[in-house]
Amino acid sequence: MNISPTPRRYNSRNGGIDFNDENYLAFSDPVNRDANGNGIGRERIVPEEYKLNSRMINRLIRQNKELMNKLDGKQEEIDRLNVLVGSLRGKLIKYTELNKKLEDRQNVSRSSSGGSNGMETDSNYIQLPKRRNNKDLDKDTDPRLSKDDRISVLSEKLDMLTKIMMESRNSSLASPPPQQQQTANIPTPASAPTAATSSTSPLPPNTSTSVWQRPSEEDIMCRESMELKQLEDQIESLKRKLLIKRENELRKISLSQELLELMGKLSMEQAQVQQGAAGSTATTVPPRTSTAVPSAEQHVSSSSPEFCMECHHTKTHPLHQHHDHNHILRNDLNSRRPTVPAINPLETPTPFAKRASLAASTGDLTDTINRVW
């Protein structure tokens, strides 16, 4: 009778394992468990030191994370404190400035109160002369006049005052007063330096105010306008001097350039004249040398006897008389020599005629040699 075998799923490799034990981990491999069912098969292989190290490392990692979180919190707190410190510093600066201003005001108020309690003197006030013409005062204080009209009136007054001041100054410079003339005509040892200083220094303008009174605003404005005009005149004179100086410098430069050009032309003309004189002397010298050389050659030819170039005998020698030669005498050879030029003495002279060419021109060379010997 055929019976089906028992399936393997009901049989385990470790027969004594209880899968319903609560001490075992879920989904654990039965191979990792020992035969008694304790479930620590692989853990026995790992030593205890490694386990302790891993636990310490995990603990240190957790502590590191906690410390990093604490550091982040501290950094945020520091940033908030920095912002607070900056705002407090700005407020401190602001309040210190306000405190200084208040102290200055208090000092000014104290000084003003102390001055009012003291004695009042004339030097504490500006003294102005009284106006004599009420019409001008009425015109100035007239509310119907506009601002432009007031400005025009003031400008007219200033022009009139400047004209009067300039006229008075010119008149004082042109004609000194009679008292000064008399003192200048009769100088004394005590009054001589005073007269010299008074004649050199201009007289002050005659003002209607007394010595102890202070100058008015109009006088001050007139004095300032006069000083400005004097400064303008000085500036214009300095400008004219500068222009004249620049023109003189430019003229000097142009004249120096013309002088250099003329000197260059003169030197070139002198060089040309010297070259022409040297060329004329060079052309006149060669005829003298050409005439002198033939005279020397004639003297040599007259003093030296005539020899035959083939037999080397004179014409009167008996051996020479037996031969019929086309004689080329030494004097003829000397006459054929080229003269040394005087202008260019280092030129290459033409070579003399060779003996072979001379023999070929006179006849057969072998025949002449046989005849000689």
From Swiss-Prot:
Organism: Zygosaccharomyces rouxii (strain ATCC 2623 / CBS 732 / NBRC 1130 / NCYC 568 / NRRL Y-229)
Coiled coil: 54-89, 222-275
Keyword annotations: Coiled coil, Cytoplasm, Cytoskeleton, Nucleus
Gene name, Swiss-Prot/TrEMBL: SPC42
Biased composition annotated in UniProt, kind: Basic and acidic residues: 134-151
Origin organism lineage: Eukaryota, Fungi, Dikarya, Ascomycota, Saccharomycotina
Localization of this protein: Nucleus; Cytoplasm, Cytoskeleton, Microtubule organizing center, Spindle pole body
GO CC term, one of those recorded: cytoplasm
Name this protein carries in UniProt: Spindle pole body component SPC42
Superkingdom of the source species: Eukaryota
Disulfide bonds: none
Region (Disordered): 104-151, 169-216, 278-299
Stated family: Belongs to the SPC42 family.
